[in-house]
Amino acid sequence: LRSRYYYGKTWHEGWINAVNPFRATIVLGTPGSGKSYTVVNSFIRQQIEKGFAMYLYDFKFDDLSSIAYNHLLNHLDAYETRPKFCIINFDDPRRSNRCNPIAPEFMTDISDAYESAYTIMLNLNKTWIQKQGDFFVDSPIILLAAIIWYLKIYEGGKYCTFPHAIELLCKRYEDIFTILTSYPELENYLSPFMDAWKGGAQDQLQGQIASAKIPLSRMISPQLYWVMTGNDFTLDINNPEDPKILCVGNNPDRQNIYSAVLGLYNSHITRLINK
């Protein structure tokens, strides 16, 4: 980055170098101070020129995405394998690719389903972060994890998407538990719910289920459902055989909902790129 500074009663011209771009770089500044223009935009351009894969969070879509797209068109020769340019944009699905953040092929154990449930529920309920371990915090996470894992093992994961999980959760709990507990690997996982059901503690059970339903109901949206049920690309963005430049768009007016969903994508991307 070009720099100009005053020292010794003289103006000097120089460069600011990110010596190790693979380590974290923090850019601090007040709104409107020029963080994107002076630093972030240069990062985007230079990383594309060096042939890197990229995960770009565009808070005000499509400010940064347009820069990345146009610069990529002019520097495709920097890549050994031509990268895919992918977009996740919930505001305008016509300008978005589709991607399933809980794709069954990337889940090998029920703990993977739990991590997905944990991420989305805590992103939707920020106050739960300080209450981890509480009964009415852990219960909805476990229930959602069980539903995700059921969708993973049912018919080879054909319906394993987050919208399907939300829709199944909204059905009658008598039907949900009858289906889930018919699978041995979920029977013990859901034993606290079954004990409450068989013990006649209906109020407690409905409270547990409502703790999962109410926050997730905020995500019921045709746009979110459409984007999250497709498989246009996978989240292993730094795969040498299939590199990607992924731009995810947010909207300041809807950030409470979109940020929770994007947090799910983020957790899976982080896990996959570090393998």
Put a short name on every predicted segment.
Residues 1-5:
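Charged, amphipathic alpha-helical linker segments immediately N-terminal to NTP-binding catalytic cores
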